[in-house]
Amino acid sequence: MTSQVNAVPTDSLAARLARPELLSLEPYQSARRIGGSGEIWVNANESPFNRTGIDGANRYPECQPPGLIAAYAAYAGVAAHELVCGRGADEAIELLIRTFCVPGQDSIGIFSPTYGMYAISAATFNVAVNTLPLAEDFSLPDDISALTGSKLVFVCNPNNPTGTLLPLGEIARVAKTFPNALVVVDEAYIEFAHNADGSPAQSATSLMAEFENLVILRTLSKAFGLAGARCGFLLAKPSVCELVMRVIAPYPVPVPVSVIAEKALSVMGIAQMRADVVLLNKQGARLALALTEAGLSVLPSGGNYVLAFSNDVEVLARALTKAGIVARRYSHPRLKDAIRISYASEQQTDSIIEAIGRIDSK
């Protein structure tokens, strides 16, 4: 017996915004979704042989591994049915565009400069991109109404690559300004962010009960140190999650990834992550100070990186390259004099600071 498609309330914002054909779409019913009970499993054309030593590697995984979903829901403070797991936050970006944007008709909105995959993902699906420049200090402009009409409005917080952290009041302002759009808050770096008083920055999950149009993206790539595992999460109202589940691939979370991710989300794993964040933020402060003392202008950062500006940034770029250090430059006009350097280990930071010390940007 196949599992039933969960109904999406027709009066929900998600139903009004979704691509019309998805409201009646019967998603692919994989063998794992159909389920069943028994001793011998021959319903999915799998191999009976497991030659890897990894338990379950020869079997298709659950689309949404229950243990992983429960672990991240507990960590994020949301209900399990308000969560979708996929191959990093990048997949969540694509899933949202595929679910809610009609190619050649709809558009997304972004505040620039920001993470490039919002625009790239939209372009690959023939979805237009409405762009609004950030203010001079890279905060949100006072008037953001120019993005009205966008189906999805992306807000990277902390912003990549500037590191700018928006207060929750600004996130609420965006949600209020665009009641007929989904406001997607990308919190890939939220674990690194702190308020001016040193307290941890509050996640926009605290606004989910108030705003039906709020979607939050999270990842295990940054603070949890699992970039190679590709595991991310979409947090939203159940109606949004249900529609996204109609377009997601049958098996987005490989068995080894699920095992690694659940371990990272254990009590010990979370404690280790928080300890790592403290260490990395300490090295980031050292890095920012060294750059400032070398005459560069460094933006306050809520991420695990610093963005530094110099009229002769090429001098620093060459010094880093000569020392075998690979940093990030940008082609965006507002970032042509900038370089982004990720936080590193103490020993690596020593090497970066040594390379910075060889330049004179003053």
Curated annotation (Swiss-Prot):
SS bond partners: none
Pfam families: Aminotran_1_2
Entries under PROSITE patterns matching the protein: AA_TRANSFER_CLASS_2
GO biological process, one term: L-histidine biosynthetic process
KW Transferase (keyword) present: yes
EC number: 2.6.1.9
Post-translational modification N6-(pyridoxal phosphate)lysine, affected residues: K222
Single Gene Ontology MF annotation: pyridoxal phosphate binding
Gene3D superfamilies listed in its UniProt record: Aspartate Aminotransferase, domain 1, Type I PLP-dependent aspartate aminotransferase-like (Major domain)
SUPFAM superfamilies membership: PLP-dependent transferases (SSF53383)
Reaction equations catalysed: L-histidinol phosphate + 2-oxoglutarate = 3-(imidazol-4-yl)-2-oxopropyl phosphate + L-glutamate
Cofactor: pyridoxal 5'-phosphate
Matches recorded under CDD domains: AAT_like (cd00609)
Pathway: Amino-acid biosynthesis; L-histidine biosynthesis; L-histidine from 5-phospho-alpha-D-ribose 1-diphosphate: step 7/9
Transmembrane segments: none
Keywords associated with the record: Amino-acid biosynthesis, Aminotransferase, Histidine biosynthesis, Pyridoxal phosphate, Transferase
Family according to the record: Belongs to the class-II pyridoxal-phosphate-dependent aminotransferase family. Histidinol-phosphate aminotransferase subfamily.
Alphabetical list of PANTHER family matching this protein: HISTIDINOL-PHOSPHATE AMINOTRANSFERASE, HISTIDINOL-PHOSPHATE AMINOTRANSFERASE-RELATED
Assembly notes: Homodimer.
Protein name, entry field: Histidinol-phosphate aminotransferase
Organism: Shewanella amazonensis (strain ATCC BAA-1098 / SB2B)
